[in-house]
Design a protein with these regions (language model features):
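Short, glycine-anchored, charge-dense loop/turn motifs used at functional sites
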Residues: 60, 157-165, 290-299
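Short beta-strand scaffold segments in enzyme catalytic cores
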Residues: 141-143, 154-157, 193, 289-291, ...
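Intrinsically disordered, glycine-rich low-complexity segments
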Residues: 27-38, 46
Length: 348
C-alpha cells in the first residue's frame, strides 16, 4: 500500500468512490436482487449446491375455503387442504380465523358461547397435533377459547412434532356492524410473541391485529422471521359499497416491507348468513388470501371465490442478511417512541 502523502490521497479517493457507489443507485438494486433471490418455489430445509450450504429455505402456505356451520365438516376440509399444502412442499400451513364454523360474531347471541372450548383437551387441536406430527408441518390453529369465565379469540401454535408451543390471544378486538367481537372475546392477555418452531421463528396475529403496525414490529423485535395472520374479513352489512380488500392487503404488505420479513394471510370465502336478535346479517367474505415477500411484494394471491392452497418458499438466511444490510433495526430510536405508550399522543 502506498504510504506517502500522494498515496494516502489516492487511497482516500478510492475509498470515497467505493462508499459513494455503496450509497448510490446501485445499492438498492443489489438489495432488491438479494431479496428476490430469497423467494422461490417450495422445497424446504437447507440445500447444498456445489458442496456448499446455500441457506435456510422454508416453504409457507395459506389455505382458504368456505365454511359451513358444521364443525366436523370444516375440520375435515382444513385437514384435506393442509395435506394438499404438504404435498406442495409446505413446512408451515396457515388456516383462516375461527374456521370451525360460520363467523358467528355477526350477531350477539348467548347460545354462541357454547362454541367455546378450553385449549386443553380441545378435539380440533388434538386432531391437528396428530396431523402436524404425521406430516412434519407447523400449524397455527385458530379457535374460540374458553378459559374459566374468560373467552378469547386464540391461536395454538403446533410444531412439526405435534408439540403445542403455546397460545396467542387476540389483542385488538373489533366492534362494529357484522363484526361484534367484543360481545364474545376478552382482550388477549398473552402479549405479542415469537414462537420458535422447527423451521422458523414465527409471529402470529389475528385479523384485526393486522391493522396495527405495532403488533408486527413487536413480533419481529422478538425474533419473528415470518408473520402469519389468520383472518375473517368481508363485506360490511351496513354498507354494501364499502370494499376494504385492497386496503387490507396494502396494510399487511407494509408490515412485511417495513420489517423485511415474509407475511402470510389466510381469509375465508363464501357468503354467510347468521340469525341475529333483530333478523339476519350476511357477509360475503373476500378471500384474497396471500403471501407477501420481505419487500412487501405479493408473491402468491388467491381470488375471492375459490378454495385455494398457496405455497411460496423463502430463504430466511438470505432475507436476514438483507435485513441487516438495510439497518432498519440498527437505526431504531426506542427512546423517542414513548408517545406510542399513550392513547392521546401526549407525553406524561
Amino acid at each position: 500500500m502506498p504510504c506517502g502523502p500522494c498515496g494516502a490521497d489516492f487511497f482516500f479517493l478510492v475509498k470515497m468512490l467505493c462508499h459513494f457507489s455503496f450509497l448510490g443507485g446501485e445499492q438498492p438494486k443489489r438489495r432488491q436482487r438479494e431479496v428476490e433471490k430469497g423467494v422461490g418455489e417450495a422445497s424446504g430445509g437447507r440445500e447444498m449446491a456445489g458442496g456448499g450450504e446455500v441457506g435456510r429455505k422454508v416453504s409457507v402456505a395459506a389455505v382458504q375455503f368456505a365454511c359451513t356451520d358444521v364443525e366436523s365438516e370444516n375440520v375435515a376440509t382444513a385437514e384435506r387442504l393442509i395435506r394438499e399444502a404438504h404435498k406442495k412442499g409446505a413446512n408451515i400451513v396457515l388456516v383462516q380465523e375461527l374456521f370451525e364454523g360460520h363467523y358467528f360474531c355477526q350477531a350477539q347471541r348467548l347460545d354462541f358461547f357454547q362454541r367455546a372450548k378450553p385449549c386443553q383437551g380441545n378435539p380440533t387441536i388434538i386432531r391437528l397435533q396428530k396431523l402436524a406430527k404425521e406430516l412434519e408441518v407447523v400449524i397455527p390453529v385458530s379457535f374460540f377459547e374458553e378459559a374459566n369465565n374468560a373467552h378469547y379469540n386464540s391461536v395454538a401454535i403446533i410444531d412439526a412434532d405435534g408439540t403445542d408451543l403455546g397460545l396467542y390471544r387476540k389483542s385488538h378486538i373489533p366492534d362494529g356492524p357484522g363484526y361484534q367481537e367484543k360481545f364474545y372475546f376478552n382482550p388477549g392477555d398473552t402479549g405479542f410473541k415469537a414462537f420458535k418452531t422447527k423451521y422458523a421463528t414465527i409471529g402470529v396475529g389475528i385479523c384485526w391485529d393486522q391493522w396495527f403496525p405495532e403488533c408486527a414490529r413487536a413480533m419481529v423485535l422478538q425474533g419473528a422471521e415470518i408473520l402469519f395472520y389468520p383472518t375473517a374479513i368481508g363485506s360490511e352489512p351496513q354498507d354494501n359499497n364499502l370494499d376494504s380488500r385492497e386496503h387490507w392487503k396494502r396494510v399487511m404488505q407494509g408490515h412485511a416491507g417495513a420489517n423485511l420479513v415474509p407475511l402470510v394471510a389466510s381469509n375465508r370465502i363464501g357468503r354467510e348468513t347468521v340469525e341475529t336478535e333483530h333478523g339476519k346479517s350476511t357477509i360475503t367474505f373476500y378471500g384474497n388470501s396471500f403471501i407477501a415477500g420481505p419487500t412487501g411484494e405479493i408473491v402468491k394471491l388467491a381470488n375471492d371465490k375459490d378454495e385455494e392452497v398457496l405455497v411460496a418458499e423463502f430463504d430466511l438466511d438470505e432475507i436476514k442478511s438483507t435485513r441487516h444490510g438495510w439497518g432498519i433495526f440498527r437505526d431504531r430510536r426506542p427512546d423517542l417512541y414513548k408517545v406510542l405508550l399513550t392513547l392521546d399522543g401526549e407525553k406524561s
